Amino acid sequence: MLCRRRRVGAAVRWLSRLAPPAPAEADPVVVRVDGSNVARLGKPKPGPRPRQLLSLPPFPGGGDGDPLPGRKAAAPRRVTAVSWVKHYLADVPQEVVQAHFNKRLVYSECSDHEVSVETIKSQKHHLKKIKHNDVMEPGMRIHLPVSVAEGEIKKRYETIPTATLHPNKDEIEYLRRLVIHKDSAILVLNKPPKVPMKGNLPVHNSMDVLAAAALSYGNEEGPKLVHRLDRESSGLLLFGRTKESFTRLHWLFTSVNLAKTNSQVWNAACEAYMQRYWALVIGTPKEREGIISAPLSKVLLDDGKAERVILAHPSGIDGAQEAVTAYRVMGPTIHGCSWIELRPLTGRKHQLRVHCAEALGTPIVGDYKYGWFVHQRWKQNPQPDFEPFTGEPYKLRRPEGLEIQKGSVLSKVPLLHLHCREMVIPNIAKFLSSNGEWHENGAPWSKEKPNLLRFIAPMPAHMKISWNIMSSYLV
């Protein structure tokens, strides 16, 4: 009985992150010869330690839980081993995780597999090597070397419900509180910062997956993203609830001319389409307002593992895309920063961030990808602020009762200050019947409905604090 307990204890220590204890018996004394040919007595050098493995929670599977309210039971989702590992090791570079799979250092263990005490003594009998594209099965557990983490591991166990990969009840309620408009054709919500737009399985806390699960409101299919915002930015986000509304609004956000039809009413509504962003930038543009027409192109970095958007070469031989942005300075320069209003006339990736940083020379506060060096100079060399009309200096003061939110302009590491505040779009529900039929001049029963919809989203907490701080100064 005592021998059996020792064997089980040894197996548990093998799977732990701690090294096994040193043997109780005394180590033999050996003779060592150093570089000076001097013989010394001492303990032998320690040999290689047994590989320490990190164990991830068992895979829950996606088809066992009850379907969400208003949704039909979905088929189990296909999740690969590399996706499951990347989800829990969010802070580890993807190439490090993939390298461990390539070296065949990742093992799998099925929880319902019967393993005897004698088998536990040799881990090779119930741990098998797996590939990155192997499909996870319910109850499967993954083991991989602790070295993959290279330090503290950020565990995200709380983001995955125990029995399903769908959002939990709290996430559904939180997302529905963000909705500011809902009709038969569209959904509009105020996206908070730091929420990704799209995520690969099993990462379910992205806007597309959350909305599809939580904002269906009884429809067989969830709403689909019409456009995108950057992960760090915030503001108005538009979803199409039907295939027809999603398609036509997606054309509108791509090009106004692409969305036009033979209907004068619909075309006039498309011409009125508009988006307005508010941003806090470092410095002040030379002109108070204007239009930026600077084509953009993408370049690949780190052997294709990352990409960056830059201003295109004037020759246009690098696959440039047209990008046009209208801007207006909203006030004086305070604390070395200025509030500006941005109107994108085209929809390119990182268009506003690149135009502010490279075309205007005033990167957005918190945009470390395109304004890292300007942020360094801004923090290290604070300059006095001057009233642009009188030329007199002034200083910041903190209003009474105002709490400094982490991420505001006075924070050591400010968050991105880019917010989609206003949006004007056609009232597409007026042109669609209940069965999805398109009416060029509007459905007969919807003549009293307006042709346009206008939405305004309040700023997130860190931008509100920055706004209040910068609007409170002494002359």
Curated annotation (Swiss-Prot):
A GO cellular component annotation in the UniProt record: mitochondrion
Pfam families cross-referenced by the UniProt entry: PseudoU_synth_2
Enzyme class at the top of the EC tree: isomerase
Keywords, ordered alphabetically: Isomerase, Mitochondrion, RNA-binding, Transit peptide
Presequence positions on this chain: 1-15
Source organism, top-level taxon: Eukaryota
Chief localisation class: mitochondrion
Gene3D superfamilies (alphabetical): Pseudouridine synthase
Single GO BP term: enzyme-directed rRNA pseudouridine synthesis
GO terms, molecular function: pseudouridine synthase activity; RNA binding
UniProt-annotated catalytic positions: 230
Disulfide bridge positions per record: none
Catalytic activity reported: a uridine in RNA = a pseudouridine in RNA
Residue segments, region Disordered: 40-74
S4 RNA-binding domain mapped to chain residues: 90-160
EC number annotated for this UniProt entry: 5.4.99.-
InterPro entries associated with the record: PsdUridine_synth_cat_dom_sf (IPR020103), PsdUridine_synth_RsuA/RluA (IPR006145), RluA_PseudoU_synthase (IPR050188)
Subcellular location: Mitochondrion
Record-linked PANTHER family: MITOCHONDRIAL RNA PSEUDOURIDINE SYNTHASE, RNA PSEUDOURIDINE SYNTHASE 3, MITOCHONDRIAL
Protein family membership: Belongs to the pseudouridine synthase RluA family.
Protein name: RNA pseudouridine synthase 3, mitochondrial
Species this chain originates from: Oryza sativa subsp. japonica
